[in-house]
């Protein structure tokens, strides 16, 4: 490959440079272009004129520099780069002219490099270009010159003082700048930058050699470079809060500073610049020292005032005493407020006192107020003289009202402490009686507390369970003291005791009689107690022994109690109150399980090791609670309830507690009109399904009555059901094969029960005016019914007359012989037999009933019990009157029809 000694320039470019003249090119004509812009005729402001003058001066400097400079030399920053740059850039100069190209002018590689070496620039545009031989000679001279400078620097021949080095540095920097022809857009951008730099330099006061700015005073933020800001003074103070992240950022910052120092030789800085940097470094060191001092300073909480601890040390043994003393002082203050209100209590201001005490619960500890209230009431009631009933009743009403307003905890705590106080005084009094201290006057404290508990029971504070437990204590050991207590409770709460649990009252009376017989002598007070118990059993208490009524006071408190929630009496027993330490607080849910653990687990105590150890025992607990509850869905499917609506109705009726519960469940189903029509058939089906084992159940008749009251059109459905039953009992065969097949599977006993239940059910509907007597128009009384049909009609009339007679019965006062007189009114029976019966059916129905009552109706066969029984005699009396009255009413109606 042939080696070339120089750079080959294309001939096309050389020909273009030789032939073309760029002196008249508008792109390089600066002054003329400016003159044309000035000649546009636009009016310039003073500020714009000054800008134009500064631009003209700058252009003159540039133009003189282009003309006077014969060549531009580049002095590289490093010696090695300067030696290589002279060889590389020789070929870019050809015939003393620079090629002008838009691509080359915009290239960073050709025009922005620091290593560009240019040849001589023609001073005049008309000068002739150099030949190829002259160009090669020029390049060789430049190479020799560059090698000579490099060798001199390496051998140490270039020496001089600081002034000479500075002069050389300035000369080299001037030679670095290469002036090329600029486009108008670049020239205008350059002018704008120069104008901006001169403007800001003037504002900052930078003139001549003064190239650094300093703060004039402490308020000069720009000159001081924001030295006065606290953020920059305390910067880095909280680096420790960020842990390793802060150390990483500090190390990165140091690396950046080190890298900047390493490349500082590339920048041409003057001596003044180094002096300024020294000053800045000193100030930086001072600021770092100040920041270190601030960093060691302790942090204070700005939200807490500085205080000095003057409290003395309190040993742990005395701290609890201090807390107790503080609690006692608080409790004493609350007690004063509560007692002040309790001492003012009366009938007239009871609502005001209750309101004041209720407000104390909002501002003071609830438990302290409850304790003070209970203690205050017991101190007032526990007096050794008998207090008035109205006085004690006010305090019972106060405790009841506050318990209802403030919750069950207030009432439970009050009842607990009251019963404990009563038992304490009762045991003391019984001990005195056992010691034969009869001469001593008995205390009235127990009587007053028993009166308080009785009124609490009257207000609905506690249930009858607690009162019965207390009465059983008195009955177990009858004497003068217990007799007086028992009479006191009966006089206040006798009527409620009898109404809540009559069987328990009967048991208590029998136990009292049994214990009284064992006594050698019965005191007059004990005999009076037994007579009073007998009167209470018979509901004949004398008004003279009754205590003050509580109903007016309870009515007066309704204005306060309307805003409170519903209240159920406390279902607490005397056993729960006695065993509160072992079983826990009885008013809390689940607290009583703690005392009943011995019933589920066997616990053995190891006395040899003096430690209790529980033996692990396998206990099989069978939860048979759910086994007793039938699965009504399965039963409904077994009873052929083949739709969801029928199953829902069946379950609602069969799973209800009573007929009202069944009615509410049916209402919740929200049945449509067509769906409601399913209810009568399902009610009758349930009646027949239940009759096989339980006999007749009046519950289904009550459900039918309640449903017909709500949906009156259902009476028509029951009427059609009645006619379907009658058709079964006619002599001719019935069309429905399914029902006959079902009845064929039943034995004679089940058939009789089925007929009996149907007859009594429809008899009840007739007696309650659900069905009218007009339904008998399709009943063939004379010769059209079989034996089962005759039996069905007998039972129907039996139930009809029995129910009507019961409603028509009126009891009068006793006569002179002591017997009660009972009379009957035939108005209701007349309405049943004649009302709502169409005239065309009246004759047929009445004649058929008259014949059936005279020939077939034998009510004695259906009476339950034996002659002489109270129920038997009552039913016989009612049926005898009803049958006789029905005959007379029918005869009168037939006479009226015939006439």
From Swiss-Prot:
GO terms for cellular component: FAL1-SGD1 complex; nucleolus; nucleus; small-subunit processome. The keyword Calcium does not apply. Keywords: Nucleus, Phosphoprotein. Residues 335-540 form the MIF4G domain. Residues 65-77 have a biased composition (Polar residues). The modification Phosphoserine is found at residue 736. Residues 24-33, 134-143, 162-174, 251-264 have a biased composition (Basic and acidic residues). Residues 644-781 form the MI domain. Residues 24-181, 248-326 are annotated as: Disordered. It holds the Pfam family MA3. SMART domains: MA3 (SM00544), MIF4G (SM00543). GO terms for biological process: hyperosmotic response; maturation of SSU-rRNA; maturation of SSU-rRNA from tricistronic rRNA transcript (SSU-rRNA, 5.8S rRNA, LSU-rRNA); ribosomal small subunit biogenesis. It is found in: Nucleus, Nucleolus. Interacts with PLC1. Present with 3060 molecules/cell in log phase SD medium. Involved in osmoregulatory glycerol response, probably through its interaction with PLC1 which regulates the expression of GDP1. PANTHER family: CELL CYCLE CONTROL PROTEIN CWF22-RELATED (PTHR18034), NUCLEOLAR MIF4G DOMAIN-CONTAINING PROTEIN 1 (PTHR18034:SF4). This is Suppressor of glycerol defect protein 1. It comes from Saccharomyces cerevisiae (strain ATCC 204508 / S288c) (Baker's yeast).
